[in-house]
């Protein structure tokens, strides 16, 4: 019996740290293969999937800025880090015979296609996995904001936020506070008012204004992407 997706089109947001695994830096080949297998499994269902990968496993713009670098330069370096991650994920997906396209906000024709909204949608309609890289092409904006913007542009039904060190949204850091409560459901306004660190406030406000749901869950548990796509109750669901 064919497995049915709850959503027609999803955006999967992965932090760069999720690809690093326990090492905290670089790309862990075991982790990226696991993520690719999960994404490929979803792509075979009746669900179109786009992926946005952060670059924190290689470089963080804020880190460079804190060290005295020009913030714009540091952020552009971070965008290039996301391209490295995107190409690594594309390679892992193509090894699984999963048709994949990388689209970058900064033009680099030799390695990827330039981001064009209509082209991205067409790739999704053709059941290709689309990986968005290089953020939105401007400094001062996070990859969380990229996920929110691209989800609105391609009219995704939900943003799936795969985390590497937490299995949902908590009232406090569960590693520090033993009394921290895990939320099964939140609203965007609650998330903003309570200062819950799901994504930055720019991205959170954008999701609220454009009525984009979020599902926050652990990427480290095998099969969780598929479970989220099928509508199983995992992690924390955030809606308007």
UniProtKB/Swiss-Prot annotation:
The keyword Ligase does not apply. Transmembrane segments: none annotated. It catalyses: UMP + ATP = UDP + ADP. The keyword Manganese does not apply. Residues 21-26 are annotated as: Involved in allosteric activation by GTP. It comes from the Bacteria. It is found in: Cytoplasm. GO terms for cellular component: cytoplasm. InterPro entries: AceGlu_kinase-like_sf, Asp/Glu/Uridylate_kinase, Uridylate_kinase, Uridylate_kinase_bac. One of its GO terms (molecular function) is ATP binding. GO terms for biological process: 'de novo' CTP biosynthetic process; UDP biosynthetic process. ATP binds at residues 13-16, 56, 60, 164, 170, 173. Signal peptide: none annotated. Keywords: Allosteric enzyme, ATP-binding, Cytoplasm, Kinase, Nucleotide-binding, Pyrimidine biosynthesis, Transferase. UMP binds at residues 55, 75, 136-143. Allosterically activated by GTP. Inhibited by UTP. Its EC number is 2.7.4.22. Pathway: Pyrimidine metabolism; CTP biosynthesis via de novo pathway; UDP from UMP (UMPK route): step 1/1. PANTHER family: URIDYLATE KINASE, URIDYLATE KINASE PUMPKIN, CHLOROPLASTIC. Catalyzes the reversible phosphorylation of UMP to UDP. NCBIfam families: pyrH_bact. Homohexamer. Belongs to the UMP kinase family. This is Uridylate kinase. It comes from Staphylococcus epidermidis (strain ATCC 35984 / DSM 28319 / BCRC 17069 / CCUG 31568 / BM 3577 / RP62A).
């Amino acid at each position: 019996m064919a497995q049915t997706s709850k959503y027609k089109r999803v955006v999967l947001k992965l932090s760069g740290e999720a690809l690093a695994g326990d090492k905290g830096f670089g790309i862990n080949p075991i982790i990226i293969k696991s993520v690719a297998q999960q994404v490929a499994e979803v792509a075979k269902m009746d669900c179109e999937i786009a992926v946005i990968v952060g670059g924190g496993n290689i470089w963080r713009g804020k880190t460079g800025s804190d060290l005295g670098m020009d913030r714009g330069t540091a952020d552009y370096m971070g965008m290039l880090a996301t391209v490295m991650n995107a190409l690594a994920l594309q390679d892992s997906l193509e090894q699984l015979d999963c048709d994949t396209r990388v689209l970058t906000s900064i033009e680099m024709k030799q390695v990827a296609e330039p981001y064009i909204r209509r082209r991205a949608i067409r790739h999704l309609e053709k059941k290709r996995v689309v990986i968005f890289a290089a953020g939105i092409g401007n400094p001062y904006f996070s990859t969380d904001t990229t996920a929110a913007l691209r989800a609105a542009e391609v009219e995704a039904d939900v943003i799936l936020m795969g985390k590497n060190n937490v299995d949902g949204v908590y009232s406090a850091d569960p590693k520090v506070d033993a009394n921290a409560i895990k939320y099964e459901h939140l609203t965007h306004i609650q998330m903003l008012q309570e200062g819950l660190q799901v994504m930055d406030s720019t991205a959170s406000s954008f999701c609220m204004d454009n009525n984009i749901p979020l599902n926050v869950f652990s990427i480290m548990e095998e099969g969780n992407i598929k479970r989220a796509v099928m509508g199983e109750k995992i992690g924390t669901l955030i809606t308007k």
